[in-house]
Each structure stands twice: as C-alpha cells, then as structure tokens.
Amino acid sequence: MELNTIKPASGAKHAKRRVGRGIGSGLGKTAGRGHKGQKSRAGGYHKVGFEGGQMPLQRRLPKRGFKSLTLKYNAEVTLADLQVLAADEVDVPTLKQAGLVGERAKVVKVIKSGELSKKVVLKGIGATAGAKAAIEAAGGSVA
C-alpha cells in the first residue's frame, strides 16, 4: 500500500445534498422547507427556548440555588484522618503532602467524625466545636 493509493472506504464519503435544483432531485422548488412560514425563509428561525410568545419554561420556573466558586478552595478533614496521620503538628501543607486535601485547598476545617486518641496540635486549621473538644480531650490543641 502506498500513500498515493489510500482512499476512504466505499460509502464513507457523501456528496453534499444540493437542494432547490429541479424536480428530478426530489428537493426542488421549496428545497424541503415546505410552503411559507418563518422556517421556510432565509435567516428565519426562533431563538433557543422561544415558545411562540408564551412565557418560556426557564422563566416560568423559580430561580434556585447557586454553585459556590470558593468551594474548590475549602476542604474538610475528619478526626479519623488525623488519627492515621503520622505528624503531631498538623497544618495545611502537611495535609496536602499526605493527600488528605486537594492541592488547591486554602481553608481546611476538622470535623468530628471518627475517634482520636493521640495528641495532635492544629496550626492554621479550623475545627468544629465537637472536633475541638475531642482534640483537647486527647491532649492536643487548636491554634
């Protein structure tokens, strides 16, 4: 096989349909657009969501919620995660290294989920009231 002999498989290529070129083509006169009306005219069609003047669905339904753009910079860590962590002093870079929070995380908060039995010192990390109590009960602190 040579590069100059390669051609597409039969049936893979189709000739462009030429509309409005006589009765014999099957798409003559109105070119498959029917008679009159907005859809038959050049450049004539409605915008997306237009319902003929009726109030469109996206305007009939109530506005609801939003997606926070700061969410990708926030992260949560559980007490169980801190239990398996080797470090005694925990800060955001330590958690990133351990793979417990994403690389883009800026704000980290510890939530009370699981048990904590070892002493842990949090630096620059927030904690819920329950998590703070559990950390202090284990001999740690939240700075």
UniProtKB/Swiss-Prot annotation:
Q: Name one Pfam family in it.
A: Ribosomal_L27A
Which InterPro entries does this UniProt record tie to the protein? Ribosomal_uL15 (IPR030878), Ribosomal_uL15/eL18 (IPR021131), Ribosomal_uL15/eL18_sf (IPR036227), Ribosomal_uL15_bac-type (IPR005749)
Ranges of compositional bias, category Gly residues: 21-31
Q: Which GO terms describe its biological process?
A: translation
What GO molecular function terms would the record report? rRNA binding; structural constituent of ribosome
- Give the residue ranges for region: Disordered: 1-51
Keywords from UniProt, A to Z, are: Ribonucleoprotein, Ribosomal protein, RNA-binding, rRNA-binding
Instruction: Reply yes or no: does the keyword Ribosomal protein apply.
Output: yes
Q: Which GO terms describe its cellular component?
A: cytosolic large ribosomal subunit
Function noted in UniProt:
Binds to the 23S rRNA.
Q: Which family does it belong to?
A: Belongs to the universal ribosomal protein uL15 family.
Q: How does it assemble?
A: Part of the 50S ribosomal subunit.
Per its record, how is this protein called by name?
A: Large ribosomal subunit protein uL15
Species this chain originates from: Methylibium petroleiphilum (strain ATCC BAA-1232 / LMG 22953 / PM1)
